């Protein structure tokens, strides 16, 4: 999912500040570790579209988008609540631009303790 090491609360808060400064709306999504990656077992192929195209890759939204969010501490509080409710799930923060009606960015804020997908840069190989 990410080549970055886990983000600290301070780093997440700075990202939220940037999101809010651009008038975007933060939102949390989560997925069980066996459903987080797109694959044949958890996706629906949509007819004769491109052979590798898979649909139904959506994660579950945690509550509603945070329309009234004013600072990073509010998002951190929701991350903690989501982690407490779903400790073995991946959790990502995404943000939406209401003017363009698109998702602007997304990144992991919680990797489950059972996850084995992250490797330190020294341990990676191509």
From Swiss-Prot:
Pfam families: RuBisCO_small. GO terms for cellular component: chloroplast. It comes from the Eukaryota. Its main location: plastid. InterPro entries: RuBisCO_ssu (IPR024681), RuBisCO_ssu_dom (IPR000894), RuBisCO_ssu_sf (IPR036385). Heterohexadecamer of 8 large and 8 small subunits. Belongs to the RuBisCO small chain family. The lineage of its organism: Eukaryota, Viridiplantae, Chlorophyta, Ulvophyceae, TCBD clade. This is Ribulose bisphosphate carboxylase small subunit, chloroplastic 1. Keywords: Calvin cycle, Carbon dioxide fixation, Chloroplast, Photorespiration, Photosynthesis, Plastid. It is found in: Plastid, Chloroplast. The keyword Chloroplast applies. The keyword Cytoplasm does not apply. The basic functional RuBisCO is composed of a large chain homodimer in a 'head-to-tail' conformation. In form I RuBisCO this homodimer is arranged in a barrel-like tetramer with the small subunits forming a tetrameric 'cap' on each end of the 'barrel'. GO terms for biological process: photorespiration; reductive pentose-phosphate cycle.
